[in-house]
């Protein structure tokens, strides 16, 4: 991101432009989906070139999104700034990510918005499972 200095740490966030059924109760299913997508050069060669491990902003009955992504203010600390791939800041840290209001909407890896009005993550704006509505709970 252009606002950072060499050596600064940060996170990137994007919405996949393809979807998967939210029927699995295993958070690793969603992490694998997002990781395989991000590291597939046919979808986005720049993302794939980063060669990093990606996790889903998703909650199941067993795992909350803030824990799955290492952005839990209590256990992971203040965190770092989070940016969209187009250089827009999304959140200034873990507290900002989960305070119910992010600076910019999360876009797809192409920079656009999904035509669907809502992306189901099974999570509340606080990054915890939406009680009874976590991924894999509704078929």
Question: Regions from the language model: what does each represent?
Answer:
Residues 1-139:
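Secreted/extracellular ectodomain signature
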């Amino acid at each position: 991101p252009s606002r950072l200095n060499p050596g600064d740490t940060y996170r990137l966030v994007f919405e996949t432009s393809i979807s998967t059924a939210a029927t699995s109760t295993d958070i690793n299913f969603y992490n694998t989906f997002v990781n395989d997508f991000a590291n597939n050069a046919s979808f986005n060669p720049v993302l794939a070139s980063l060669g990093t491990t990606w996790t889903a902003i998703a909650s199941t009955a067993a795992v909350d999104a803030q824990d799955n992504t290492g952005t839990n203010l209590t256990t992971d600390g203040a965190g770092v700034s989070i940016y969209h791939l187009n250089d827009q800041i999304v959140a200034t840290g873990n507290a900002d990510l989960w305070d119910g209001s992010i600076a910019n909407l999360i876009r797809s890896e192409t920079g656009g918005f999904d035509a669907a009005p809502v992306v189901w993550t099974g999570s509340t704006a606080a990054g915890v499972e939406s009680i009874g509505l976590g991924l894999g709970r509704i078929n």
